[in-house]
Curated annotation (Swiss-Prot):
Region entry C-terminal, spans: 769-860
Name of protein: Chaperone protein ClpB
Protein residues bound to ATP 2: 610-617
The UniProt record lists the keyword ATP-binding: yes
Region NBD1, annotated ranges: 161-342
Gene name in the database record: clpB
The organism of origin for this protein: Leptospira interrogans serogroup Icterohaemorrhagiae serovar copenhageni (strain Fiocruz L1-130)
Summary of subunit composition and partner proteins: Homohexamer. The oligomerization is ATP-dependent.
Amino acid sequence: MKLDKLTSKLNEAIYNAQASAEKLGNPEISEEHILKEVLSQPDGLVPLLISKLNLSPKSFLESTENALGKQPKVGGNTSADVGFSRSAVSLLKAADEVRKELKDEYLSTDHILLGLMKNGTGSLKTEFLKLGLEYHKLLKITLENRKGKTIMDDSPEGKTDALAKYAKNLNELAKQGKLDPVIGRDEEIRRTIQVLSRRTKNNPVLIGEPGVGKTAIVEGLANKIVQGEVPEGIKNKTLYTLDLGSMIAGAKYRGEFEDRLKALLDEVKSSDGEVILFIDEIHTLVGAGATEGALDASNMLKPMLARGELRCIGATTLKEYQKYIEKDAALERRFQPVYVKEPSVEETVTILRGLKGRYELHHGIRILDSALIAAATLSNRYISDRFLPDKAVDLIDEASSKMRIEIDSMPEELDRANKRIQSLKIEREALKKEQDTASKERLKTLERDLSEQEQNFQTLKARWDLEKSKIGRLKQIKEEIEKYKNLEAEAERRGEINRVAEIRYGKLVDLQKELESANEELKKQESASRLLKEEVSEEDIANIVSRWTGIPVSKMLQGERAKLLLMEDVLKTKVIGQDHALRLVSEAVQRSRAGIADPNRPIGTFLFLGPTGVGKTETAKALAEFLFDDVNAMTRIDMSEYMEAHSVARLIGAPPGYVGYDEGGQLTEAVRRRPYSLILFDEIEKANPEVFNIFLQILDEGRLTDGKGRNVDFKNTVIILTSNIGSEILGSSEYTSEEKERLVEQRLKKHFKPEFLNRIDEVILFHSITDSVIHKIADIQLEGLRQKAKENGLDVSFTNELKDYVSKAGFDAEYGARPLKRLIQREVGNALSRYILDGKFTNGQNVTVDYRQGKVVVVV
């Protein structure tokens, strides 16, 4: 007997057997050591064969370990002289005899077990016979497993039963009810069946955007095959999905991956068309396993695909199909494309209705139909970079998950009561140490209060536990219904009519009644007194959308409505003297939040015109602060940086092949990260005219395609463009208001193209600041300075004389409010800073800033 032709698994087992003998202190490697290692190989042949005989590999392993425990042991270092025992040599000889009979080249682990059961003489064979293992049955299952092949190399394990190892049986999953129902994809499933039924090139490839339901179509086909709702051509066929990850994992040596793939393909081929192979992300096969001089996986598939020996369904996205499969013309012609389009909102609602039961069962909650409609419509409108129905299903799943967590967590009311009790207990312990009368009186009052609070807490807790148990019971009944529906479908497939009738008209009817009564019981509790909510509503979906995108799509609360109605007044406190401009901006935002604006355009597009320093940029800042509670929550793009025609690439991202392609554009990336935002394009007349072309689609369609070809959604942005065009006309006192408007309009038409001006919602003229409003502006600027001083521990007030002085000295009709800001900064700011630096003040001190004898002074 030669020991040079052992399979890698048997080599590994013998090596481990030697290590095991040394560890246990046994003087020799016995047949028990070898069999223990052979039986404990998780992906070995022996456990697989025993399982196929409907026996437990675990019981055989335990029996072997018991026999090992009775082996003699020696003390000291045994590693030097551990050799094979007589029983081990006999076992290997018996295995070699079996190998010769089966005409195998290599000695494998299955030969070891066959050799033991055929020619073994020890107690282990007797034990195995008691456990039900017989030689002729073992030989029969071994030959069946090999499918007429002999062992010609050292890794047969990777090639036997390759389908079971490297693919998942979708038919089995469908029978067990583990696949989600597939709704509204009949046309695509029919087209797939049509291609599969061809004589040659019967390989459909499903092409569609990520998340449109390509894999779901194959799962739908598996369901239809199991239910027998398919043409004769593919009736009783078995659908397997290839697990490329497990095929590549552990393929250490060159050619091992190809061996495994070849074995799997041969198994599919030998099934005579009974197996249909589904390869998800089929583009991963192109280049898989292609090391130096080796074929890649796709080239191994080509001959079988062309001859019709392999029926295969592929699935990939359009981008990857173009990148990998279209490049390889020979591979492309062997596949027949089936395009899977994104479903409409109405179709998505139908799909969600079909899936609703599964999600209700998993999370143990109820999903209202209005929530399904909201998930489809809101995801379509606000989540633009993903596809239906995937994004709508995700919304339902996350809202349900949030609801489940809330049911399992302590309700807010109960949590508050618990914290109050803890606080009172701490106070009680502190009062017990006090001896005065007031403390003793307070302790008595506190004891009564604590007793009431604890009683209230126990009542609330009992209510919570009761509601939880009722919701839990609902989940339990639904699980029972699902289980019996699967049993009914299985019985129907087997033709057990009596069993079907027993389940359908007996058990399911009873469970349905039980479910209705449990629902009624839960509804009896007043909704106002309920601690737990177990229904996912439209509002819950809207909250999840808001959390994902930052866009406020949930129903407006009373406080927000009042805030929006007062929007104009709030803005007037920040920007003085531009009431007309503020009214137009407020109206646009109110229209959008009330839901009556055009949903396919930005919230509002405004062109602010006027001389410098009149409040154009300040209005944008005030609006950002009002909408987002943060003055910095706006994307400001200074158009003076875009004077060259090529600088448009900085806004939308460099095209492929240029430096900076991966970085994206300043504008598009800002909006992708924050879809609900304010974008300020400052001083647009300074930009190159070419740059305005990108504004056309933003202002009209509310979208822009960036350098990577992605659509960026501007529908939830407020766009403000500022310009100084015609500022000398608006600042002049020579013209009337009507003349100013007409002259500025003429200037605009000269500078901007008609298609650009036509897309702007409102052109808002900011008029020069008059001396009547300069006092109010001075008040705002001084208040800002007062706040800064307060942060440094100084409480400042300003006299009317000072206010009169800065208003007169800082007013300049030509330059607006900026000279006033500079004057306050220079004179009042300097006076305060000198006072602080002199160290004359104490923290929290009150000082007054006055104007006396032509000087700004600080008075304590």
